[in-house]
């Protein structure tokens, strides 16, 4: 199954486009299971991740997912990781990052971070970059089972053949919990609107447009399932669309709220039968997660239609046997 995500920003003329190969890695769940740590992790970590990440998408007073009502919707937030390479500083220091349309910040681990997660990943050495500018401000970002804290700075960011100057980013100095310990990526590069940012300053793609680095104000994702023939496993194209990777016309949708990439979804059906959202509802497109989330009553309706039952801990071992949504 191939999926193509196209996101349009605003009218712009630039000078280039760049391809970033993406790699798909085993989920955190799979890695913890292989190491025999999954059950302990699920027992010890019960974050209300949905409320933290998506609550602002819903009107005030809308019931959202409650803790323990659907644990898979909480713990599956990193079950599909597609990451690519960037570099920071001069001389360049390389990092693997998740290109995430569900957040707007760029951060990587700092050389001063003392958390276990940082010790297992590449860390930015600000003192080795002759183009680094220390900001002095601090930031905090919540991610499911924990959070990270850090300090802000500015430096040169290179993605493919594109170099963006004076990019604001974060150096994490504290990454508690197991969320990032088994992750194959080092940090996150957010592609959402600036209003979603925890770190002050423009997101990376906004700066690319401001510095006239891209031909078009468009970035597109190609994400493939892992198969013997899926080469590449994925690709991010900054500044354009690869027409060889899809067939038929593109269905362009207007952004209904600038923060997340929020759009109007017409309906949700299970095997052709409408389950909820019959007159349309708001949804967000998020490359940083694989969960389906929404108001409690709608999610309960969806779970009933596919034969799912709530559980506090455990694994979904028979997903392929469930009805298609």
What are these regions (language model features)?
Residues 112-114, 195, 244, 298:
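Acidic glycine-/aspartate-rich tracts in secreted/extracellular proteins
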Residues 94-109, 273, 278-305:
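Active-site beta-strand/loop microenvironment that shapes enzyme catalytic pockets
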Residues 15, 302, 310:
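Active-site catalytic microenvironments in core metabolic enzymes, especially phosphate/sugar-handling
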């Amino acid at each position: 199954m191939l999926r193509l995500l196209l996101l349009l920003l605003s009218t712009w003329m630039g000078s280039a486009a760049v391809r970033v190969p993406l790699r798909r890695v085993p989920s955190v769940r799979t890695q913890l299971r292989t190491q025999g740590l999954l059950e302990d992790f699920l027992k010890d970590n019960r974050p209300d991740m949905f409320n933290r990440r998506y609550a602002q998408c819903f009107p005030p007073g809308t019931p959202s997912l409650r803790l323990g009502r659907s644990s898979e919707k909480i713990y599956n937030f990193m079950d599909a990781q597609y990451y690519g390479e960037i570099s920071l500083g001069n001389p360049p220091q390389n990092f693997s990052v998740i290109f995430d349309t569900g957040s707007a910040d760029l951060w990587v681990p700092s050389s001063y971070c003392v958390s276990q997660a940082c010790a297992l990943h590449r860390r930015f050495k600000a003192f080795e970059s002759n183009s680094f500018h220390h900001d002095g401000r601090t930031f905090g970002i919540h991610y499911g089972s924990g959070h990270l804290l850090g300090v802000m700075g500015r430096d040169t960011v290179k993605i493919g053949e594109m170099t963006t100057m004076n990019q604001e980013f974060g150096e994490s100095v504290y990454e508690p919990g197991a969320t990032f310990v088994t992750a194959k990526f080092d940090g996150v590069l957010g592609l959402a609107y600036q209003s979603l940012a925890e770190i002050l300053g423009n997101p990376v793609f906004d700066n690319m447009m401001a510095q006239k680095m891209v031909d078009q104000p468009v970035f597109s994702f190609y994400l493939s399932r892992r198969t013997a023939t899926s080469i590449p496993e994925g690709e991010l194209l900054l500044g354009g669309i690869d027409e060889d990777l899809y067939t038929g016309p593109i269905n362009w949708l207007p952004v209904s709220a600038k923060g997340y990439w929020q759009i109007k979804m017409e309906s949700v059906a299970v095997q052709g039968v409408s389950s909820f959202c019959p007159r349309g509802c708001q949804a967000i497109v998020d490359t940083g997660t694989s969960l389906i989330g929404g108001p409690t009553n709608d999610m309960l309706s969806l779970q009933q239609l596919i034969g799912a039952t709530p559980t506090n801990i455990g694994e979904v071992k028979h997903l392929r046997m469930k009805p298609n949504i």
